[in-house]
Amino acid sequence: MLERGAESAAGATDPSPTGKEPVTKEAPHQGPPQKPSQSAPGPTASAGSPPRPRRRPPPQRPHRCPDCDKAFSYPSKLATHRLAHGGARPHPCPDCPKAFSYPSKLAAHRLTHSGARPHPCPHCPKSFGHRSKLAAHLWTHAPTRPYPCPDCPKSFCYPSKLAAHRHTHHATDARPYPCPHCPKAFSFPSKLAAHRLCHDPPTAPGSQATAWHRCSSCGQAFGQRRLLLLHQRSHHQVEHKGERD
């Protein structure tokens, strides 16, 4: 009796079925095993450091323009861009005979009529109507231009400017778009479309400057009088004394 009471009081071991070694009883589980907390910082991350931002993948631009080297993410963007190559300018300026392919170009142009230039250059007295114009101008103050032309000593701030320069000055077929009205030819369809306005100047509805200025020597027309004066000086050696450009 005393031996049985001592065994029941101990409660820690039971005799094994073979009677050789005692088997230790395990305490019953109170629930599923708890996983280690995930909020604890690992060996490579500190508790106070912010998470590293993930790098965005480069944008996919599968829609390439057949007239130039630009590419776009959506077909609608490509269709809007191709208006510039086709010469379509459905957005006329109400203050002069000029017209534009995009509403944003028209808005930027109208600032030239209002005279608003809210973006001054911090390095010189010039000011600009748009931040993009100021950003392009700031490159003129940069000590270096990182895109040199391999065919001449010129260098450029943007790859697009270098590509346009090489296409215009160093390509064998630099001017594949001839004008049907005169011997001139151009490198881009947009340049040809702008030139053809000289032969057939449009009249924008509601325009206040419908009177074009035509050269009496060659018949070329200009939307502004100062451009006519510059043309006559450079092409026909005509001097206009006492007149402001």
UniProtKB/Swiss-Prot annotation:
An example molecular function term from Gene Ontology annotations: zinc ion binding
The keyword Disulfide bond belongs to this UniProt entry's keyword annotation: no
Basic residues composition bias: residue spans: 52-63
Cross-referenced SUPFAM superfamilies: beta-beta-alpha zinc fingers (SSF57667)
GO CC, alphabetical: nucleus
Keyword vocabulary terms for this entry: DNA-binding, Metal-binding, Nucleus, Repeat, Transcription, Transcription regulation, Zinc, Zinc-finger
UniProt entry tagged with the keyword Zinc-finger: yes
GO biological process, one term: regulation of transcription by RNA polymerase II
Pfam families assigned to the protein according to its UniProt record, in alphabetical order: zf-C2H2
Region (Disordered): 1-67
Cellular localization per UniProt: Nucleus
Record-stated family: Belongs to the krueppel C2H2-type zinc-finger protein family.
Gene designation: ZNF575
Biased composition (Low complexity): 36-49
Function: May be involved in transcriptional regulation.
Chain ranges of zinc fingers (C2H2-type): 63-85, 91-113, 119-141, 147-169, 177-199, 213-240
Protein name: Zinc finger protein 575
